[in-house]
């Protein structure tokens, strides 16, 4: 676009130009596998990365490119890569940075699927992880080793909604010449611009707020373009010639978007966790109303939090905007627009009581997703974080009497009444 625009304008227009053939205002779904070369020279140039363009939809596609450009614009990054799922985006990010013999530092209060990837799956390939209290900077510092290649956090933790001190953490991590990675799924780029607080790479499960309607699985990696891979000295894979692509050097030949380009031309090319054009189209539809939806999500959530915090059957509500939350000051600093609509609360009692409340709800759907237009509920200890040991659950702040809510776009009075009736069953 020719000049700088605000978020609400970018979410509707960034990454899209009018289709030159049909003049369609809506973005077409380019449901194709491959693309015709003008001549043999163009084919050679495209494969050698000497010319931008489309070769095969596993690597690039016009519908996906529009989605990637739009989310990059909303995050303030230099480039993005769409993937088949949020876990694919996270896995690609880690595998691009860390190889066999390398090490990761990660927040202990992260999504159960991410925890399992780091603790159980990646060690089989020689990548180990130390889980830390991300709020304890001394503990983070002590965990970083010579072979540590990244520090991984969540902008809003899942499911505790804990908030890292981004600025302080980024300063510490960058002193060790490694990047700070943040899963920005729960926050969205509308509630926080993580790149302005020192994060180098953001990942999303586009399945959540970006799509917004629980219809599509997808993920996306966004590159800030700010990390200096050459000066770091720890990432030769982005600096040295790549023999699989005619000895291209990503830092020399691509520049600021070196990281995200390398992920596309190596990991996506070779392992193929590509987003479908149809899903990209649905995610673009979701982005058009992202700010409006998130505002309503937040408004509903804050009213429900207020109700639950005053209920006699509720032991605790974990929501950073509450005055007594340990994250209240960080919420005020980093999240002036709100801290989203996903949070947990603990009922008085144990697992039996938590299950009874969940099973008594009528509007809330009991399922393992969040950030849908519809309100959702789940019991983290037995579902999303059920693969974790009791000790690991405790370290992540998960207890048997805890319930996670994802507040949707329904009338908030109806949602409060649904919760009131369910809590009366205790």
How would you name each of these model-derived features?
Residues 271-274, 278-280, 285, 289, ...:
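Conserved small-domain helix->loop->beta segment predominantly found in fold-type I
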Residues 39-88, 113-121:
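Conserved N-terminal alpha-helix of the aminotransferase class I/II PLP-enzyme fold
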Residues 2-61, 69-70, 403:
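N-terminal "arm"/small-domain region of PLP-dependent enzymes with the aminotransferase-like
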Residues 156, 185-187, 322, 348, ...:
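Active-site beta-loop-alpha junctions enriched in small/polar residues
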């Amino acid at each position: 676009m020719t000049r700088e625009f605000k978020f609400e304008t970018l979410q509707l227009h960034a990454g899209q130009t009018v289709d030159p053939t049909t003049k369609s205002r809506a973005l077409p779904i380019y449901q194709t596998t491959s693309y015709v070369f003008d001549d043999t020279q163009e084919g050679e140039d495209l494969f050698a990365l000497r010319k931008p363009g489309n070769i095969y939809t596993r690597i690039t596609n016009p519908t996906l490119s529009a989605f990637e450009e739009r989310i990059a614009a909303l995050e303030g990054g230099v480039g993005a890569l769409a993937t088949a799922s949020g876990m694919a985006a996270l896995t690609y990010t880690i595998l691009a940075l860390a190889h066999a013999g390398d090490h990761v530092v990660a927040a202990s209060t992260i999504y159960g699927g991410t925890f399992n990837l780091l603790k159980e799956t990646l060690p089989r390939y020689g990548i180990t992880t130390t889980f830390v209290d991300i709020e304890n900077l001394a503990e983070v510092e002590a965990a970083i080793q010579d072979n540590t290649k990244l520090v991984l956090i969540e902008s809003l933790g899942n499911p505790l909604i804990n908030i890292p001190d981004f600025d302080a953490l980024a300063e510490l991590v960058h002193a060790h010449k490694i990047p700070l990675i943040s899963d920005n799924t729960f926050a969205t780029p509308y509630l926080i611009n993580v790149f302005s607080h020192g994060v180098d790479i953001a990942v999303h499960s586009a399945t959540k707020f970006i799509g917004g309607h629980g219809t599509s699985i997808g993920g996306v990696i966004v590159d800030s373009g700010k990390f200096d891979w050459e000066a770091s000295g720890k990432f030769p894979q982005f600096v040295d010639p790549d023999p699989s692509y005619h000895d291209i050097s990503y830092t020399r030949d691509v520049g600021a978007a070196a990281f995200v380009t390398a992920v596309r031309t190596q990991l996506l090319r070779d392992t193929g966790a590509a987003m479908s054009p149809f899903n990209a189209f649905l995610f673009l539809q979701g982005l058009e109303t992202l700010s409006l939806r998130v505002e309503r999500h937040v408004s509903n959530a804050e009213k429900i939090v207020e109700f639950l915090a005053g209920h006699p059957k509720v032991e605790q509500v974990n929501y950073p905007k509450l005055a007594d939350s340990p994250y209240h000051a960080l919420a005020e600093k980093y999240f002036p627009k709100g801290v989203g609509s996903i949070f947990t609360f603990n009922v008085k009692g144990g697992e039996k009581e938590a299950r009874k409340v969940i099973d008594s709800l009528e509007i809330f759907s009991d399922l393992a997703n969040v950030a849908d237009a519809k309100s959702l509920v789940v019991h983290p200890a037995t579902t999303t974080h059920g693969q974790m040991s009791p000790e690991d659950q405790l370290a992540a702040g998960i207890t048997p009497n805890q319930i996670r809510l994802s507040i949707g776009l329904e009338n908030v009075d109806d949602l409060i009444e649904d919760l009131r009736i369910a809590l009366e069953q205790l």
